Each structure stands twice: as C-alpha cells, then as structure tokens.
C-alpha cells in the first residue's frame, strides 16, 4: 500500500530498535493502555509471529514509511488494526507517528491508505477509533478524514492522577 511519499509495509526484523523505543516511551503508554515497559525479547517474539493472518489474530500492525523520492525509505510510525470482527465487518484503528515526524501529514496519508485497505481488501463496513478527549490533534485528524463521534465515555481512563474522557469515532464505507 503506497501513495507518492508514504508506504505501509509489514514488520521486518530491522524494526526492532524502533519498536523498542516507541513501545517503551512512557509519554505514549497511555495511548495503548500500557503500564510497564516491553522487553526486547517480547518484542522479538511479537515480530516472529507478526506474519500471522488478521483473520486468526484479529489484529495487524504495519509500519509507515516515508520515501523522499530518491529511493530512501525511513520508518516514521506504525499503524494498527485491532478488534477485527469479520462477521460484523468492523475493525479498530490506531496510529503512532514518531515524535520527530509529527505534523508533516504522514498520519493523514497513512490513514487514507489503511481505510482503502480496510474497505477494499478486508471488506469492512466500519472502522472505529477511541481517542482521549484532550488529544485535540488526533481528534482533528480523524474528523478531517470523515470519522464521526458516536460515543463519549466519561472518566474512562486514569492518567497522571486525573480522570480523562474517551471519545469513540466511526468511519463508514458508504459504497457498500
């Protein structure tokens, strides 16, 4: 999956250092409901099993790469599908862009590619995401792409000794 500057690809063993850094950054733990660091061994095992089919694991993690046009590709983030329900034709989506690559449009491009993949390859009817109410950049990103708010969970997450609301958004494939 790719467009002019962004491609989405499967995980490779060479991604271990990036995944280790991203998964062990306490500033983003709350996004994945993580409360402890991941060992390199655990992440290596995850990579070994990452080839398994989304229909059996109900989840899929892919890497987002930026291509500068000179055959140089750099991993700038990851994108996840989770809670895949083929019977009900829905899946959750989450995205992480490395801090130094944010605000460059990569997330928007990657999400467009993944929505196309969900609707045209996985035959999904709806994609959903859960965003903390104070994550204004993510809310703006997802709503610009046509996600609509469908639920507001009050005091859903406990973060830094404060309750945080979580908002659920949905995006529908209106062509099927």
Predicted feature residues:
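Acyl-donor (CoA/ACP) binding surface of acyl/acetyltransferases
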Residues: 1-15, 70-176
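Short structured motifs
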Residues: 46-49, 77-79
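Generic structural signal for secondary-structure transition and capping sites
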Residues: 16, 27-28, 52-55, 123
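A short, well-structured alpha-helix characteristic of acyl/acetyltransferase catalytic modules
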Residues: 1-45, 175-176
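A generic structural motif
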Residues: 65-67
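Short Pro/Gly-enriched beta-strand edge/turn motifs at strand-loop
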Residues: 43-48, 150-152
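Surface-exposed charged/polar residues within alpha-helices that form helix-capping/stabilizing sites
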Residues: 21, 49-52, 99, 116
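A short helix-loop-beta-strand connector motif used in the catalytic cores of GNAT acetyltransferases and
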Residues: 48-63
């Amino acid at each position: 999956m790719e467009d002019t500057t962004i491609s989405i690809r499967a995980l490779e063993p060479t991604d271990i250092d990036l995944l280790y850094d991203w998964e062990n950054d306490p500033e983003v733990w709350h996004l994945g409901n993580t409360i402890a660091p991941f060992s390199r061994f655990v992440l290596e095992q995850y990579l070994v099993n990452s080839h398994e089919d989304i229909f059996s694991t109900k989840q899929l993690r892919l890497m987002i790469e930026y291509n500068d046009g000179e055959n140089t590709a750099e991993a700038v983030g990851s994108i996840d599908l989770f809670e895949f329900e083929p019977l009900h034709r829905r899946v959750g989506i989450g995205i992480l862009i490395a801090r130094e690559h944010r605000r460059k449009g990569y997330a928007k491009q990657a999400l467009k590619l993944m929505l196309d993949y969900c609707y045209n390859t996985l035959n999904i009817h709806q994609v959903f995401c859960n965003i903390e109410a104070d994550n204004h950049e993510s809310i703006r990103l997802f709503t610009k792409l046509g996600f609509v708010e469908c639920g507001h969970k009050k005091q859903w997450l406990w973060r830094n000794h404060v309750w945080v609301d979580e908002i659920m958004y949905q995006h529908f494939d209106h062509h099927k």
